[in-house]
Regions:
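Short, hydrophobic/aromatic alpha-helical segments in well-folded domains
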Residues: 9-10, 52, 114
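Short consensus segments that form the blades of beta-propeller domains
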Residues: 2-3, 39-40, 105
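A structural signal for well-ordered alpha-helical segments within the folded catalytic domains
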Residues: 16, 43-47, 109-113
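Post-HExxH zinc-binding segment in Zn-dependent metallohydrolases
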Residues: 26-83
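Active-site-adjacent bridging/hinge elements
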Residues: 22-26, 88-91
């Protein structure tokens, strides 16, 4: 692979992985977590890691094009994943939620773009933790 800025890419990757390590010190996914809890945790964990990898520039970055182009498709996949009842397919959804091409990682992208849409509430969202993350989305889907 060739990158225009290998040093910048390496820095983003280090920030991303460090974010995971720090998040996991405070928040852990229980072994008994339900499938829906696992998806919510992935949105929280990957969302924060992907957001933080963007760096401090994200505060002044206009992400409206990202949101317009990628948020609804990510949420649509998240909705499909949450309504899946077949256990073997659930394993596939959990895998696809965080792997593959960047914009196809629907849990990571849904979480990141949700956070970008709520930059003024990041501290509150973080302190509430994964169990309340994206409540308007998860709670609505869980009721249906």
């Amino acid at each position: 692979l060739s990158y225009k800025d290998p040093q910048g890419f390496a820095q983003q990757m280090m920030t991303h992985e460090t974010a995971h390590a720090m998040l996991h010190k405070k928040w852990q996914l229980k072994e008994t977590a339900s499938y829906q809890e696992q998806l919510r945790f992935l949105c929280f964990d990957e969302g924060f890691a992907h957001l933080l990898a963007c760096g401090k520039e994200i505060a002044s970055f206009d992400a409206s094009m990202w949101i317009q182009e990628h948020y609804e498709p990510a949420l649509a996949q998240l909705h499909q994943a949450l309504t899946c009842e077949d256990e073997s397919q659930q394993e596939e959804w959990l895998y696809r939620a965080q792997t593959g091409r960047y914009w196809d990682k629907f849990a990571a992208i849904a979480g990141k773009l949700y956070l970008i849409s709520h930059l003024d509430e990041l501290e509150k969202i973080y302190l509430e933790g994964p169990q309340k993350f994206m409540s308007p989305i998860f709670d609505t889907l869980e009721r249906n």
